[in-house]
């Protein structure tokens, strides 16, 4: 606390000098309740090597934190620091972050917003909570989430590849029509080269049991969350919670246009390209898929 006061006095003194004004340092110190001798000792203190390194690490922490759109906590920042060669513990990073007054965005656990529309036994849970396929385009999952704006709710439909947790397609709409889901599925099919059987998993919402959806996914194996167990779709439900926690909830969103711009920025410039994920060995989804493709290609060359 005292160091912060000294820093404030120093900054105000420098600002006054640059402006050509006189300022009473003693008066400021007296008003703030700190000693002149203590301030002068602080002012002429030469940082030790340890202090210099600590401040350098804190600067790196701030850069990583800002680059993550101020989302990363100590675990992910520790991983990123170690990638640059820093030898540091997660506990130390957490201590520094506390001193710096920064922390990860907090989120309450995601809540269920979808009501099942079909409880028939014909809809099978093929996925059965097996959330870790061994290749891309083995399992996709899809879901819809509500986003509040001043103009009214808009709806984000997403398709995730469970292998990398990459959002491979998304659509923002002003209605809950099944056509919005179909558009998203078609985008996903156009962007991915599907040459093997594919499972697509969803909850039992009306859009996902409609005949139009079944037609759009006729060459896929449709899998549905069990009756009254929508958390069987936990990965993409969790993603929708994360995009709100890390990004959308910071803004008082005016309308569809602003919501679209914010979602585009988060998904296309951060989530798939930069945001590290524990599931991906602390790589981004794009990097995780590139590593798979490179390893898979090398294995094929060695085998052939």
Residue ranges and their predicted role:
Residues 1-25, 30-32:
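Helical coiled-coil/dimerization "stalks"
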Residues 48, 87, 131-132, 149-150, ...:
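Conserved, non-catalytic sequence blocks in retroelement Pol enzymes and Pol-derived host proteins
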Residues 218, 242-304:
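C-terminal domain-tail junction helix/linker
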Residues 9, 29, 39, 61, ...:
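Mobile genetic element proteins and their domesticated derivatives, centered on retroelements
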Residues 129, 133-168, 174-175:
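An active-site-proximal beta-strand-loop segment
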Residues 148, 152, 170-193, 209:
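Active-site beta-loop-alpha junctions of metal-dependent nucleic acid enzymes
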Residues 1-7, 36-135, 229, 284-293:
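Basic, flexible linker segments flanking DNA-binding modules
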Residues 113-117, 202-204, 210-212, 224-244, ...:
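RNase H-like two-metal-ion nuclease catalytic core shared by retroviral integrases
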């Amino acid at each position: 606390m005292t160091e912060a006061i000294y820093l404030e006095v120093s900054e105000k003194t420098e600002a006054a000098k640059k402006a050509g004004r006189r300022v009473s340092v003693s008066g400021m110190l007296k008003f703030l309740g700190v000693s002149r001798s203590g301030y002068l000792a602080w002012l002429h203190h030469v940082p030790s090597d340890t202090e210099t390194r600590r401040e350098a690490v804190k600067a790196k922490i701030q850069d990583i934190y800002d680059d993550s759109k101020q989302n990363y906590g100590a675990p992910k920042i520790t991983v990123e620091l170690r990638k640059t060669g820093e030898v540091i513990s997660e506990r130390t990073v957490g201590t520094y972050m506390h001193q710096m007054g920064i922390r990860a965005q907090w989120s309450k656990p995601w809540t269920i917003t979808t009501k099942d529309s079909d409880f028939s036994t014909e809809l099978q849970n093929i996925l059965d909570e097996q959330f870790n396929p061994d290749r891309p385009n083995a399992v996709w999952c899809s879901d819809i989430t509500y986003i509040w704006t001043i103009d009214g709710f808009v709806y984000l439909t997403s398709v995730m590849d469970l292998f990398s947790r990459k959002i491979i397609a998304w659509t923002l709409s002003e209605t809950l029509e099944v056509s919005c889901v179909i558009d998203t599925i078609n985008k996903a099919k156009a962007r991915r080269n599907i040459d093997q059987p594919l499972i697509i998993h969803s909850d039992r919402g009306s859009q996902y049991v409609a005949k139009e959806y079944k037609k759009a996914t006729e060459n896929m194996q449709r899998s549905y969350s069990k009756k009254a167990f929508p958390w069987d779709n936990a990965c993409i439900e969790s993603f929708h919670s994360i995009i709100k926690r890390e990004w959308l909830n910071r803004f008082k969103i005016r309308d569809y246009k602003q919501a679209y711009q914010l979602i585009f920025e988060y998904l296309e410039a951060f989530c798939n390209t930069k945001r590290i994920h524990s599931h991906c060995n602390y790589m981004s989804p794009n990097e995780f898929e590139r590593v798979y493709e490179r390893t898979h290609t090398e294995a094929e060359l060695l085998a052939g």
